[in-house]
From Swiss-Prot:
Listed name of the protein: Recombination protein RecR
Keyword terms, alphabetized: DNA damage, DNA recombination, DNA repair, Metal-binding, Zinc, Zinc-finger
Gene3D superfamilies hit by this protein: 3.40.1360.10, 6.10.250.240, RecR Domain 1
PANTHER family attached to this UniProt entry: RECOMBINATION PROTEIN RECR
Protein family (similarity comment): Belongs to the RecR family.
SUPFAM superfamilies documented for this protein: Recombination protein RecR
Biological process terms in GO annotation: DNA recombination; DNA repair
Organism per entry: Prochlorococcus marinus (strain MIT 9313)
Length: 189
């Protein structure tokens, strides 16, 4: 059981051991309920037909929300990124989940992601702006540049700003982060 927990992202050997020992101390009905919940989630949760976010319905809650701005489309790598943006309660547009990032080293090319459906959606739905919200990494930058080149004939393309986290000290920031913070600067209001 410990080996299975260690396969989960963010779970190391000590946490895996704690989880396993905790479960072994639980009553059998709670363990069965936990196992049933895992199996139910696996069989009932799929992808939204429009944005590819996780959903138990053909359309996710965001795609069904009539109050969302249909002209803005935020592109994210996966549902975790979408949920992080939703926690801000600032973005009111639609989303498109790629299902990963272009990574030749890992054997992931553009054809393995939800890029063709993104192009179709932008063209079909008359999106006025696509916001690329991809991680500031080699893979994220590669994917952003690739998408920007494909999307510019159809619509305006922007990328979220990157810089220093709130509460951080300049002296501890690396050069790339500082460069991006300077490039993404805005006028004081």
């Amino acid at each position: 059981m410990i080996d299975q927990f260690e396969r989960l992202p963010g779970i190391g050997p000590r946490t895996a051991q704690r989880l396993a020992l905790h479960l072994l101390r639980q009553p059998e009905d709670q363990i069965r309920a936990f196992a049933d919940a895992l199996l139910a989630a696996r069989s009932q949760v799929g992808q939204c037909q429009t944005c590819f976010h996780l959903s138990a319905e053909p359309l996710c809650d965001i795609c069904r929300d009539g109050k969302r701005c249909d002209q803005l489309l935020c592109v994210v790598a996966d549902s975790r990124d979408l949920l992080a943006l939703e926690r801000t309660r600032e973005y009111k547009g639609r989303y498109h989940v790629l299902g990963g990032l272009i990574s030749p080293m890992d054997g992931i090319g553009p054809d393995m992601l939800q890029i063709p459906s993104l192009i179709q959606r932008v063209d079909r739905d008359g999106i006025s702006e696509v916001i690329l919200a991809l991680t500031p990494s080699v893979e994220g930058d590669t994917t952003s540049l690739y998408l920007a080149r494909l999307l510019k004939p159809f619509t305006q393309v922007s990328r979220i700003a990157y810089g220093l986290p709130v509460g951080s000290e300049l002296e501890y920031a690396d050069e790339v982060t500082l460069t991006r913070a300077l490039e993404g600067r805005r006028a004081m209001q």
